A protein has these predicted regions:
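Mid/C-terminal beta-alpha module of Rossmann-like enzyme folds, strongest
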Residues: 105-107, 114-165
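Catalytic helix-loop patch of NAD(P)-dependent Rossmann-fold dehydrogenases
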Residues: 2, 11-57, 61-63
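Residue-level signal for the nucleotide or nucleotide-sugar donor/cofactor binding architecture
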Residues: 34, 96-99, 128, 168
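Active-site loop/turn elements of alpha/beta-hydrolase fold enzymes
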Residues: 8, 59, 153
């Protein structure tokens, strides 16, 4: 049997130069900025250390239709707020490579049959800010852009630190 471990882009610390168009690869050294990222990184290490057949799958901002009982995702949050005529604040200085849940499913299915152990990034090809994601949702759904308010990470004042940039390359998974 093969062990598939789902991980996250939050294992990274934003130190790569996004201005140069660089995305994190599977070979980049994790340096998480929060406890969630730290526990995922340590989980990756334990899987690699103890499993003889494994794949570590890093995903970022997974979106798609949520099943009953599941929490929503960025697409549903933006869509629901805008449809209700509610304003939404979104960060404009955090960049991710959002991932469609169907692509995660397809990638995991392929990795189950793949003989090589290792880390694989399964995410979208486009790196964009959270605000850009919100605007794309509004465009796709024909909803009001004026309700979207881009703010900086500092202005959002979240209690848990998040990496400003955690865009991942999917070259290895291709």
């Amino acid at each position: 049997s093969r062990f598939i471990h789902l991980s996250t882009d939050f294992v990274f610390d934003e130190k790569i130069n996004e201005d140069a168009g660089l995305l994190y690869t599977e070979e980049d050294i994790p340096a998480p900025v929060n406890y969630y990222g730290y526990t995922k990184w340590k989980g990756e290490e334990k899987v690699a250390e103890t499993c003889s057949s494994y794949a570590i799958v890093r995903v970022a901002i997974v979106y798609g239709r949520a099943l009953p009982g599941q929490h929503g995702n960025i697409v549903q949050l933006v869509m629901n707020r805008l449809k209700a005529g509610q304003e939404i604040r979104v960060v404009s200085d955090q960049w991710r490579t959002p991932t469609y849940v169907g692509d995660v499913s397809d990638g995991v299915q392929r990795l189950i049959a793949h003989p090589t152990n290792g880390i694989f990034h399964i995410c979208g090809v486009e790196c964009m800010s959270i605000a850009e994601i919100a605007y794309q949702v509004a465009d796709y759904m024909g909803l009001d852009h004026s309700l979207i308010h881009p703010v900086t990470t500092e202005e959002m004042n979240e209690t848990t630190p998040r990496p400003r940039f955690s865009g991942m390359s999917i070259d290895k998974a291709r």
